[in-house]
């Protein structure tokens, strides 16, 4: 959500920056509403001045003993016009808020201009992809061969885009969750929270999923409950309609949750394996900061997510998304992409974004310094997506005999050094 007065006063500049996102943005509608609102306010102010003047004249005439019935009738008519104009302004303001809620965030000036993922810019790379003495397998072949991943039974139980983990596969998923949380809480300074896995519509509006992305979500019938698409939603909304003390900032929270997505717009993409699922697990990092801190804190949060991959010895690259590839709520986003040898490409494993005050304004999240309060900036990112990290380990650490070496950092959590074939 944008600040109305800032948007109005900087319309041309902001419209130019928004145009770099591409797509249809109803800026003409904003201008038309603004003219309508200004006209109604101007007319109301003129009528109020006239009403005040008429009231003074009536008072004078009364003191002189003159008949003021007609003048009073005119004043009442003016008052009715003022009420009607005030209602018109109120209606326009509601339309403004609805229109503003559908306008994406303004891209930060450091974001490269572009139309698609092809225009994203790589900013750094860590680790070199391993060279295998054999043809590396994709996880959708390797997992079932090891007996740790079962797609057929998952389809029987539920349907497509679900997976069933067995034995060491399930333990590896659990080990990753615990490893992520331990590093972020003990090394990176985050406070762990365990939020509800369902939220209401107000929470989804606050973080920007509603109303635009309703089709990507799962709604519980006959209720206002929705399954969360990411822990970003409940964790950000912890402070909805609250004012933090300035000295508290930055507040750094992390949470493990399952996530649920309909993947309505992903038909034909990542149809094999567990890259794109209706249900998956993720550890999310969320920060609440002062505006002047937020881009430093975005860089730190991104580094915290990257650190997990470094500790696991997984090759990755980090790219800054161009204006045309960013999510609508974000002002700047870094994607961290892990190397998957079985697929011979890099795949997103974390998306780290600064929303500036966009979410905070929608959710009413403020901070106070002295007597002054203003909207906080919110930042979040995956730290990391658990299933995709599982895939990266299986594919990068596979051996010629079909076994998988467990990264050293995970061995205390797995109580093992290698995953060998199991037979469920």
UniProtKB/Swiss-Prot annotation:
First-level EC class: ligase
Disulfide bond residue pairs: none
Pathways involved: Aminoacyl-tRNA biosynthesis; selenocysteinyl-tRNA(Sec) biosynthesis; L-seryl-tRNA(Sec) from L-serine and tRNA(Sec): step 1/1
One Pfam match: tRNA-synt_2b
InterPro entries named in the record: aa-tRNA-synt_IIb (IPR002314), aa-tRNA-synth_II (IPR006195), aa-tRNA-synth_II/BPL/LPL (IPR045864), Ser-tRNA-ligase_type_1 (IPR002317), Ser-tRNA-synth_1_N (IPR015866), SerRS_1_N_sf (IPR042103), SerRS_core (IPR033729), tRNA-bd_arm (IPR010978)
Gene Ontology biological process terms from the UniProt entry: selenocysteine biosynthetic process; seryl-tRNA aminoacylation
Binding of ATP, residues: 261-263, 348-351
Signal peptide: none
Gene3D superfamilies membership: Bira Bifunctional Protein, Domain 2, Serine-tRNA synthetase, tRNA binding domain
Function according to Swiss-Prot or TrEMBL: Catalyzes the attachment of serine to tRNA(Ser). Is also able to aminoacylate tRNA(Sec) with serine, to form the misacylated tRNA L-seryl-tRNA(Sec), which will be further converted into selenocysteinyl-tRNA(Sec).
NCBIfam families from the UniProt entry: serS
Record note on domains: Consists of two distinct domains, a catalytic core and a N-terminal extension that is involved in tRNA binding.
Name this polypeptide is given: Serine--tRNA ligase
């Amino acid at each position: 959500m944008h600040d109305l007065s800032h948007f109005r006063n900087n319309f041309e500049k902001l419209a130019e920056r928004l145009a770099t996102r591409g797509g249809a943005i109803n800026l003409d509608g904003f201008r038309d509403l603004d003219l309508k609102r200004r006209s109604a306010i101007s007319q109301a102010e003129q009528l109020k001045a006239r009403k005040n003047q008429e009231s003074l004249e009536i008072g004078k005439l009364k003191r002189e003993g003159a008949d003021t019935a007609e003048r009073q009738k005119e004043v009442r008519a003016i008052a009715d016009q003022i009420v009607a104009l005030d209602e018109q302004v109120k209606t326009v303001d509601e339309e403004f808020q609805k229109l503003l809620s559908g306008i994406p965030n303004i891209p930060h000036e450091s974001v490269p201009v572009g139309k698609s993922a092809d225009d994203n810019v790589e900013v750094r790379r860590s680790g070199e992809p391993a060279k295998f003495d054999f043809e590396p397998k994709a996880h959708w072949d390797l997992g079932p061969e090891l007996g740790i991943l079962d797609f057929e039974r998952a389809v029987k139980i539920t349907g497509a885009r679900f997976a069933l983990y067995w034995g060491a596969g399930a333990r590896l998923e659990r080990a990753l969750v615990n490893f992520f949380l331990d590093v972020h809480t003990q090394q990176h300074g985050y406070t762990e929270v365990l939020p509800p896995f369902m939220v209401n519509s107000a929470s989804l509006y606050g973080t920007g999923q509603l109303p635009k992305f309703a089709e990507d979500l799962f709604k519980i019938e006959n209720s206002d409950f929705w399954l969360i698409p990411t822990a970003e939603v409940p964790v950000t909304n912890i402070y909805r309609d609250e004012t933090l003390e300035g000295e508290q900032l930055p507040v750094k929270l992390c949470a493990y949750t399952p996530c649920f997505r309909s993947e309505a717009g992903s038909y034909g993409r990542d149809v094999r394996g567990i890259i794109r699922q209706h249900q998956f697990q993720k550890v999310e990092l969320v920060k609440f900061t002062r505006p002047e801190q937020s881009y430093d804190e975005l860089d730190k949060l991104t580094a915290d997510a990257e650190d997990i991959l470094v500790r696991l010895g997984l090759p990755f690259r980090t790219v800054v998304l161009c204006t045309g590839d960013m999510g609508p709520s974000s002002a700047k986003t870094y994607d961290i992409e892990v190397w998957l040898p079985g697929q011979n490409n890099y795949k997103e494993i974390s998306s780290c974004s600064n929303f500036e005050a966009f979410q905070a304004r929608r959710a009413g999240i403020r901070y106070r310094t002295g007597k002054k309060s203003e909207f906080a900036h919110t930042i979040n990112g995956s730290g990391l997506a658990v299933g995709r990290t599982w895939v990266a380990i299986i594919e990068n650490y596979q051996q010629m005999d079909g076994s998988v070496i467990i990264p050293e950092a995970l061995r205390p959590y797995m109580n093992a050094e290698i995953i060998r074939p199991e037979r469920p």
